[in-house]
């Protein structure tokens, strides 16, 4: 998974009236069908059991879809009232636009970065435990400034 651009959409935009983080994410062929890799979802849920269930998509679930869901869930668990996220494949196969709502830009960016790190750790089969409190701490600090 390669992220070529991340930007903050600081007002009404093509996707939503809310503020959002938009990223361009390129996935390799094996990263475009993670729903056919049950060990990925199982390992991700071991590390982040608070993650909501995923719907089965007709086109399959990519790492970009997982990134969207994890970034949104991190913000929700940090107490941010967010609900909007989209992942849309572009005209270039394997390239996705990922959009995740935020209420505080610093929190949205930190949640997105934490989601990237978690997915990379799961893909690399890292064995160190995932501590949700440690991940949420930097997400909470900008709110209390």
What is each stretch, according to the model?
Residues 16-19, 43, 88-90, 95, ...:
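Residue-identity detector for threonine
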């Amino acid at each position: 998974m390669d992220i070529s651009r991340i930007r903050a959409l600081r007002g009404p935009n093509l996707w939503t009236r809310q503020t959002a983080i938009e990223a361009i994410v390129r996935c390799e062929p094996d990263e475009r069908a993670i729903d056919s890799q049950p060990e990925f979802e199982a390992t991700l849920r071991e590390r982040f059991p608070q993650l909501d269930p995923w719907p089965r998509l007709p086109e399959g679930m990519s790492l970009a879809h997982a990134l969207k869901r994890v970034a949104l869930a991190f913000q929700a668990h940090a107490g941010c009232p967010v609900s909007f996220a989209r992942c849309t494949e572009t005209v270039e196969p394997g390239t996705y636009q990922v959009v995740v709502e935020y209420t505080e830009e610093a929190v949205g960016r930190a949640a997105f970065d934490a989601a990237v790190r978690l997915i990379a750790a799961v893909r690399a089969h890292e064995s160190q435990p995932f501590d949700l409190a440690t991940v949420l701490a930097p997400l909470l600090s900008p709110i209390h400034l």
